Regions:
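Outer-membrane beta-barrel "beta-signal"
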Residues: 223-237
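Flexible, surface-exposed loop regions and adjacent strand-edge segments
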Residues: 4, 46-55, 126-135, 202-211
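Outer-membrane beta-barrel transmembrane domain signature
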Residues: 100-206, 237
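Short sequence motifs at beta-strands and strand-loop junctions characteristic
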Residues: 7-12, 83-90, 103, 159-168, ...
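Membrane-embedded beta-strand positions in outer-membrane beta-barrel channels/transporters
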Residues: 12-16, 92-96, 110, 170-172, ...
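Surface-exposed strand-loop-strand hairpins of Gram-negative outer-membrane beta-barrel proteins
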Residues: 1-18, 164, 208-214
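Glycine- and aromatic-enriched membrane insertion/assembly motifs of diderm outer-membrane
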Residues: 5-73
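Extracytoplasmic loops and strand-loop junctions of Gram-negative outer membrane beta-barrel proteins
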Residues: 1-3, 74-82, 150-159, 212-218
Length: 237
């Protein structure tokens, strides 16, 4: 069984500048700097997750997470978390080895592989939730709106929930079309696999708790090892 599962796929975007250092006609090193937005989802509780525990958090009046110490929820608005959609911005530095064919007509084809180092600049989440009230006398929950439905809270600051750095393996292929002289347009497709957990350590996420037994709440140890497929195009000169 599963405790967590992949949520909805996200469509991100980015832009940047690259530098190529040519070793010879067919081999070069590509690096530079680019900005990107990564989007992905994680399911914390649904009928398909047979091992899932109910997960809770509390927000203050400014919709910031409130740290949860002890077994009773802290003061604030209490919610059960069902699904979380991440929107994380990064500054990325690629280090890529690029292997090119000789020019065929006006086209040069290439494959490339290497790594990308990303530094987080901002993280937001959209949470699918249910508002709750908690009765300390019998450790029970009740729906605070008397409605059996889920709601959304958008753009909650999630810097404490996500790692500051990500490391990705990069594999791609593409083509360059020569316009004139040293000026070409290019398009390429890359697959990135990020080797470290997107989410922070449980002790750093002190505001998120799962109920392991009635009235007993422990830290959530969710893991998300994401990847993405990137379609790029631009101008070389």
């Amino acid at each position: 069984g599963k405790k967590y599962s992949q949520g909805p796929l996200g469509l991100g975007f980015g832009w940047g500048f690259d530098i190529e250092i040519n070793f010879n006609t067919n081999t070069s090193l590509r690096t530079g700097i680019n900005l990107s937005t990564f989007k992905a989802g994680l399911n914390y509780y649904n009928s398909d997750l047979t091992l899932a525990k109910e997960t809770y958090f509390v927000l203050d009046a400014s919709e910031n997470y409130v740290n949860w110490d002890g077994n009773n929820p802290p003061d604030g608005d209490l919610y059960q978390l069902y699904n979380r959609k991440f929107k994380v911005n990064y500054v990325n530095i690629p280090v890529i080895l690029k292997l090119k064919t000789n020019e065929i007509g006006y086209f040069t084809y290439y494959g490339e592989f290497g790594a990308t180092l990303g530094f987080k600049t901002k993280a937001l989440v959209d949470d699918e939730i249910k508002p709750l009230d908690y009765n300390q006398s019998d450790s029970s929950f009740s729906n605070s709106l008397n409605l059996n439905q889920k709601l959304y809270i958008l753009d909650i600051n999630a810097d404490k929930s996500t790692q500051p750095i990500r490391i990705g393996l990069n594999l791609g292929a593409g083509a360059e079309y020569n316009l004139s002289g040293n000026t070409s347009i290019f398009f390429q497709l890359n697959w990135n696999y990020f080797v470290n957990n997107l989410l922070t350590r449980p002790e750093n996420e002190a505001f998120l708790r799962e109920e392991t037994s009635k009235g007993i709440f422990n830290a959530v140890d969710a893991k998300a090892i994401p990847g993405n497929i990137v379609l790029s195009f631009g101008v070389l000169f």
